[in-house]
Amino acid sequence: LETDLDVVAINDPFIDLAYMVYMFKYDSVHGRFSGSVETKDGKLWINQKPITVFRKRDPVQIPWGSAGAEYIVESTGVFTTTEKASAHLKGGAKKIVISAPSADAPMFVCGVNLDKYDPKFQVVSNASCTTNCLAPLAKVVNDKFGIVEGLMTTVHATTATQKTVDGPSAKDWRGGRSVNNNIIPSSTGAAKAVGKVIPELNGKLTGLSFRVPTLDVSVVDLVVRIEQSATYDEIKEAFREASKGSLKGIIEYTDEHVVSTDFIGHTASSIFDSLAGIQLNANFVKLIA
């Protein structure tokens, strides 16, 4: 809504228009929406702009073309393969962006491998939020110093699939524990996914996740062994340069004493925290973003 893109249609089979207005107006993380939001003529109006609303469970039934929607963000977390996401094309969509990792769709991370995009691709994946933070971080280090190997930990804010109180979770026993008062170890494919967008790092990175009881903003903790010896000041300078140059808007550099809530609503993919990183020796370093 704050870009030059026109949001012309939304599909949600689970809530009605009145509830959409309520959910958009009030948010437990971002606060109350400062603009206007209402229903009129069977549409959702935000800041005096109409948005057509569909309520279809099967994406093949969504008439995107009738609303003038050309580029679809597939964010259900259900239709994440090329075949499943391609169902949107039936209704008149031209391109589909899956907002999650995909088993087979080409994967792209802004600032990292968009140069490999081919206009013939109709369905692409934008990877995960963690990969969007990690991949630019890894790219800067690998381009400048070379990465031999690395381990990543993400300290991840609560997600909608977690449980507020202990409950059954047959596939992930720890995932069934209450998110309100636990630090919950979990798996993540984010580090391995970096190998898909930076092929030379394939097999060199892996990682895990800790789910913590915060509402928003997550942390990537990347420990790497680098090929070319460097001081931490030299590594910081590489990130400072990237944030002002080729990765401006993707990576941001901070040298202030910030905490997680200071980044709520931030638009950068990865904010390099220069004060939080540490170095053991010239080839072994921990980076925080």
From Swiss-Prot:
Keywords: Cytoplasm, Glycolysis, NAD, Oxidoreductase
Active site feature: C129
Annotated site, Activates thiol group during catalysis, chain positions: H156
GO molecular function: glyceraldehyde-3-phosphate dehydrogenase (NAD+) (phosphorylating) activity; NAD binding; NADP binding
Binding annotation for D-glyceraldehyde 3-phosphate: S128, C129, T130, T159, T188, G189, R211
PROSITE patterns recorded: GAPDH
Gene3D superfamilies from the UniProt entry: Dihydrodipicolinate Reductase, domain 2, NAD(P)-binding Rossmann-like Domain
Pfam families: Gp_dh_C (PF02800), Gp_dh_N (PF00044)
Pathway, per record: Carbohydrate degradation; glycolysis; pyruvate from D-glyceraldehyde 3-phosphate: step 1/5
InterPro entries listed in its UniProt record: GlycerAld/Erythrose_P_DH, GlycerAld_3-P_DH_AS, GlycerAld_3-P_DH_cat, GlycerAld_3-P_DH_NAD(P)-bd, Glyceraldehyde-3-P_DH_1, NAD(P)-bd_dom_sf
Catalytic activity, EC: 1.2.1.12
Subunit details: Homotetramer.
Family: Belongs to the glyceraldehyde-3-phosphate dehydrogenase family.
Protein name: Glyceraldehyde-3-phosphate dehydrogenase
Taxonomic source organism: Amanita muscaria
